[in-house]
């Protein structure tokens, strides 16, 4: 996360609201003019069973003490992430559908970053009793739709009441080939990325700075700022690019959760090397952010290097590797010099990372 967003007041929520369709593009009148307190947990679980994708490998889904998911021979991989209202998202900026799609994407990208394919997700949700049920069920739809796109099931979870919306996802997957870790980078390798860089950070600055109306949607209302706002609200990482990178011989890889500066430093520290970004390549990425940079009057290079939450891949390849479609070279790997720590650099300077929840200086 680039940095903590400001905390706008929670929107007044009428008993009936307009919420986006399943794809979040159009707006339609709610069919559930109720608060969560008016619904039983059993009724919500029944809705989950009907709405969530079962998944291609699910043997037992929602309804038992555990789900059962078929696994190929070998190992499985598992990851978890949590999103907290007013820390990671604001319901005055994003729809429930976008929040659900976003939390799914960040977990699915972690599976992809290991060179894996997702099998199943479980979701634990804390929600306020006075939350509009239609907003809550839109979160369910966003989560389910994003999982369905990659053939993963949402096979269980837990519900509780609390002061704010909190969503914790655990994702399971398997690797069709060798697992790609963070610690395989070698001197002479090239560093490449997939997906957009800096779009989400630009969208955050546009919203936080009050440069756009938070209720605005689509190109019609947002113009050339739409890609940045939409990426912040619900990123669409190139899921599958991690599997392609693994097949192409990637030696180290991560999804871009916290931005290239931070995530490259993590690979460098794990591998005991220095990663150097190429200024021209970073400037080329930054040029795509020009519409937002003009509005916010900032250097978009900062967005590119420090912006996260887009969940494309940063991968390290042998110098003679044929890069998969969608990957662009942005730097290289060299050995540490005498008295030099493993780190990420550009123009001879150590790069400062992005936002950390507990310590602004921590990279792990």
Which residues fall in each region the model found?
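Active-site-proximal betaalpha loop/short-helix elements
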Residues: 130, 211, 226-307
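Short hydrophobic/aromatic beta-strand micro-patches
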Residues: 172-174, 314-318
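General beta-strand structural signal in soluble alpha/beta enzymes
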Residues: 60-61, 77-79, 153-157, 171, ...
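Glycine-rich anion-binding loops of enzyme active sites
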Residues: 71-73, 83, 118-212
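Acidic, Ser/Thr/Pro-rich beta/coil linker or hinge segments at domain junctions
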Residues: 36, 40, 235-236, 282-284, ...
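Short amphipathic, helix-prone segments within low-complexity/disordered or flexible regions
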Residues: 2-14, 18-20, 25-28, 32
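Small-aliphatic-rich amphipathic alpha-helix that forms the alpha element of a beta-alpha
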Residues: 96-120, 141-149, 238-244, 259-267
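Extreme N-terminal cap/leader segments of soluble proteins
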Residues: 31-95, 114, 123, 142-146, ...
């Amino acid at each position: 996360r680039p940095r903590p967003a400001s905390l706008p007041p929670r929107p007044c929520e009428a008993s009936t609201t307009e919420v986006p369709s399943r794809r979040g593009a159009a707006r339609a009148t709610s069919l559930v003019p109720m608060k969560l307190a008016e619904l039983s947990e059993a009724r919500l679980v029944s809705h989950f069973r009907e709405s969530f994708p079962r998944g291609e490998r699910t043997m037992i889904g929602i309804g038992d003490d555990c789900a059962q998911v078929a696994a190929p021979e070998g190992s499985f991989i598992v990851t978890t992430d949590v999103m907290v209202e007013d820390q990671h998202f604001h319901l005055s900026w994003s729809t429930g559908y976008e929040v659900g799609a976003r939390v799914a994407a960040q977990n699915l990208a972690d599976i992809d970053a290991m060179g894996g394919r997702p099998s199943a997700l479980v979701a634990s949700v804390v929600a306020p009793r006075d939350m509009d049920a239609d907003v809550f069920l839109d979160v369910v739809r966003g989560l389910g739709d994003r999982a369905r796109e990659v053939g993963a099931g949402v096979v269980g979870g837990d519900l509780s009441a609390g002061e704010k919306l909190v969503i914790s996802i655990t994702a399971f997957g398997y690797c069709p080939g060798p697992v790609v870790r963070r610690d395989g980078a070698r001197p002479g390798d090239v560093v490449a990325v997939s997906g957009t860089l800096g779009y989400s950070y630009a969208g955050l600055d546009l919203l936080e700075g009050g440069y756009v109306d938070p209720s605005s949607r689509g190109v019609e209302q947002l113009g050339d700022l739409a890609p940045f706002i939409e990426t912040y609200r619900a990123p669409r990482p190139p899921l599958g690019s991690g599997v392609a990178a693994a097949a192409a011989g990637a030696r180290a890889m991560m999804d871009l959760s916290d931005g290239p500066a931070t995530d490259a430093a993590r690979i460098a520290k794990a591998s005991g090397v220095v990663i150097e970004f190429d200024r021209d390549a970073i400037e080329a990425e930054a040029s795509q952010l020009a519409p937002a940079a003009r509005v916010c009057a900032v250097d978009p290079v900062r967005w590119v290097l420090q912006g996260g939450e887009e969940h494309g891949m940063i991968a390290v390849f042998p110098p003679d590797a044929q890069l998969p479609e969608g990957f662009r070279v942005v730097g290289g790997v060299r050995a540490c010099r005498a008295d030099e720590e493993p780190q990420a650099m550009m123009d001879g300077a150590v790069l400062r990372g992005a936002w950390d929840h507990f310590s602004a200086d921590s990279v792990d």
